[in-house]
Amino acid sequence: ATSSAASDVYKRQAMEDYKIDIMIESGPNARTVQLNLNPFTLVGATTRSGFLTNPMRERFAISNRLEHYDDDLLSQIVERSSGILKLKIDKKSCFEIARRSRGTPRISNSLLRRVRDFAQIKSDGKIDLEITKFALSSLNVDKNGLDEMDNKILETIVDKYNGGPVGLSTIATSLSENSETIEEVYEPFLIQQGFIIRTPRGRQVTEKGYNHLGRNKNNQNNLFN
């Protein structure tokens, strides 16, 4: 989240003094009105802390970095959510959903509901490992949590650009997708999981990315030599 210098001043004043000075009118008639605020606790969250000004960032007394949930904890979340939804599901199915959820509870709960829909049609509402894998496969969510667009990005870099490096805008054009969407929605997970890396010349698929696609990196490179 970005913030302007003017809005930062208001925020910092409110955080420090529980007051805001507002300028009314302009020119010779300009005057300042002070608004008193009730004491409050401000909690901020951003994926772009570098965009905050230093004075603004330093006003927060406690600064923590949140990590993605691990599969075991996500599995517990899926199990709890299934209880709330009154679903019949075994632990193996909970874990299978969890490990394809990209470390995010919101995705876990979304996948659980989609798996439930398949189970209601295919197995009288009971969710076992077989129906879970079938549902997730039908949704194009693979065993590593990559969806259709994730895999298209990898395939495009490998098949069209010899595995990279290739620029983001070129990838976006090849996929008829917006550059910002690829950079902000898909790329972070692919980098975090080690499927691609950023280089000064662009994005490049790693050996792990080749293995995920079932390709041999050396053989692939030989095709272009």
Language-model segments: which ranges?
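Short regulatory helix/loop adjacent to the ATP-binding pocket of P-loop NTPases
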Residues: 12, 34-37, 47-61
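Conserved C-terminal helix/linker of AAA+ ATPases
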Residues: 118-140, 150, 205-207
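The conserved phosphate-sensing helix
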Residues: 101-114, 126-128, 146-147, 165
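AAA+/SF3 P-loop NTPase mechanochemical coupling elements
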Residues: 26-45
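Conserved AAA+ ATPase core "coupling" helix
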Residues: 51-84, 91-99, 110
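Terminal-proximal interaction/regulatory segments of ATP-powered molecular machines
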Residues: 157-225
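C-terminal helical "lid" of AAA+/P-loop NTPase domains
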Residues: 95-99, 106-121, 155
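Single conserved hydrophobic/aromatic residue that forms the stacking wall/gate
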Residues: 1-6, 10
